[in-house]
């Protein structure tokens, strides 16, 4: 009995030890935190908007860029005489006919906020769905940024696991485009306004610069505008546009008896030119004599070497006649390759043309080149005018101008890679309009920033819709992500009304922060009562693209 008991005890001990050893060496299964999407297909509803179709195309492109997974896109159409096969691995975008899309839509419907979207993962589906096209677009961007951009390159995975489900609500004051570039309004402020809302007169034609070549003063904002014959007000902001104060009033002390009236333009020298150092502030504007018939106008330059506090009148770029044959609307731009400062402007003085676009250049701010044409139409009755020029990363300059003489004074863009060669002067480029025909006319401004899409962002603004619509709303803002080949329209960030004799929206202005991520947009909406006066408002818009 003793031997049998001992043997039994030994066998029990061995069993217990073996069991203990098995417990010590057994490993728990590793929880999957990524999902292989290499075998998935992107599926969209068979009937959907062109905007969502374009957005899905960009979604596919970014998925490939971030994960290395090259997925096909197909619609959810199927032969209704056959049973719908839902066994495939799919990324479902929008309200598809798949069962899991319907289930996700029910969950989303339970939320009261219209700015919501859902992302849900089942065994073989990923659902990305918003309550409308805008929120679906935001859901796709959210998916890319949070789950695709965060994985290893060429992993062909996303940072999601089966069973994941989340509902998000969008709260920011922003616009999102089909390429996922986003415009978010971050500030509205008044630059300057008449003392009374019942005043008679106009505050218009604002321009602005952010100092970049003035050492400790860099980042300061300076602005000017038209506000009568008392001189050009110089407004300053040291808190990036939140508050403003007037620091100077610029008058013409070169042309005896002339008044500073119209079309001021601010510019900061990016390099030394002649006797003037990098960081010198230049104001170019149109002066006129005080004679009763107003028979002389000039393009005159003023300089400040102390960040806009005091000014000196230094030269006339050109001089011509009065209202019917004068010189107007100067625009300055420096070209590194030629080391020239160019002054573009509108010229009424040629009897062969009602108006044409011309320029001169200087290398010392004392002497100027002979006058050269960039747009002079074959039809002498046409009046191209109000130049602004933006340099883009493809090496092209885009020049926007109005074409008075065509109904509504539509806006055109003409391009060149050389400021001294605009091709045939009778060629006035292409009209600025969307594929749907949305466009505008009069008082244009254009500018370009590297922020946004792969080609950066070209923005063009103007005064009124073309043709004049049955509305009192001002012009849209047009955006291009392909160097001005195509445009999309958004509501004007500074809403204003258009009346028969209103000056609202006359010559809006676009400029950017040094890194291009902040758009400073200025315009003159109505201040007070209809037909009374306008004030200058600033809107700051943060621009972010997928790779910003």
Regions found by a protein language model. Give the residues of each.
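Bacterial N-terminal signal peptides
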Residues: 10-18
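Sec-dependent signal peptide cleavage junction
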Residues: 17-33
């Amino acid at each position: 009995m003793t031997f049998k008991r001992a043997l039994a005890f030994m066998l029990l001990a061995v069993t217990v030890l073996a069991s203990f050893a098995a417990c010590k060496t057994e490993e728990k299964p590793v929880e999957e935190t990524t999902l292989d999407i290499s075998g998935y297909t992107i599926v969209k509803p068979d009937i959907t908007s062109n905007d969502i179709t374009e957005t899905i195309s960009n979604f596919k492109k970014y998925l490939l860029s971030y994960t290395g997974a090259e997925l096909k896109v197909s619609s959810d159409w199927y032969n209704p005489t056959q049973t719908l096969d839902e066994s495939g691995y799919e990324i479902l975008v929008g309200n598809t006919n798949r069962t899991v899309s319907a289930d996700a839509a029910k969950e989303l419907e339970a939320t009261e906020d219209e700015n919501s979207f859902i992302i849900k993962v089942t065994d073989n589906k990923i659902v990305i769905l918003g309550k409308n096209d805008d929120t679906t677009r935001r859901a796709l961007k959210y998916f890319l940024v949070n789950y695709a951009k965060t994985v290893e390159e060429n992993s062909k995975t996303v940072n999601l696991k089966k069973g994941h489900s989340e509902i998000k609500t969008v709260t920011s004051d922003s616009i999102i485009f089909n390429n996922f570039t986003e415009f978010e309004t971050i500030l509205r402020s008044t630059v300057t306004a008449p003392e009374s809302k019942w005043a008679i007169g106009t505050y218009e034609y604002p321009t602005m610069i952010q100092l970049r070549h003035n050492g400790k003063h860099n980042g300061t904002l300076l602005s000017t505008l038209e506000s009568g014959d008392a001189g050009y007000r110089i407004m300053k902001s040291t808190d990036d546009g939140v508050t403003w104060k007037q620091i100077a009033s610029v008058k013409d002390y070169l042309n005896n008896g002339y008044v500073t009236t119209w079309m001021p333009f601010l510019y900061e020298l990016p390099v030394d030119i002649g006797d003037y150092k990098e960081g010198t502030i230049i104001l170019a504007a149109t002066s006129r004599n005080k004679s009763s018939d107003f028979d002389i106008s000039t393009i005159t330059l003023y300089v400040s070497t102390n960040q806009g506090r005091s000014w000196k009148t230094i030269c006339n770029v050109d001089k011509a006649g009065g209202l019917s044959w004068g010189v107007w609307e100067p625009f300055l731009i420096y070209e590194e390759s030629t080391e020239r400062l160019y002054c573009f402007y509108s010229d009424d003085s040629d009897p062969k043309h009602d108006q044409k676009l011309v320029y001169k250049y200087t290398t010392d701010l004392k002497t100027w080149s002979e006058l050269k044409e960039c747009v002079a139409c074959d039809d002498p009755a046409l009046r191209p005018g109000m130049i602004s020029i933006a340099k883009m990363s493809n090496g092209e300059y885009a020049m926007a101008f109005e074409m008075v003489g065509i109904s509504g004074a539509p806006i055109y863009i003409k391009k060149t890679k050389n400021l001294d060669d605009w091709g045939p002067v009778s060629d006035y480029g292409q009209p600025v309009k969307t594929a749907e025909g949305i466009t505008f006319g009069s008082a244009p401004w254009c500018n370009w920033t590297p922020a946004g899409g792969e080609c950066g962002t070209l923005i063009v603004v103007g005064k009124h819709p073309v043709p004049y619509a049955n509305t009192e709303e001002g012009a849209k803002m047009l955006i291009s992500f392909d160097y001005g080949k195509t445009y999309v329209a958004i509501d004007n960030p500074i809403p204003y009304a258009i009346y028969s004799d209103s000056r609202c929206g006359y010559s809006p202005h676009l400029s950017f922060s040094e890194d291009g991520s902040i758009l400073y947009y200025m315009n003159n909406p109505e201040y007070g009562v209809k037909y009374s006066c306008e004030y200058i408002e600033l809107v700051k818009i943060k621009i972010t693209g997928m790779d910003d």
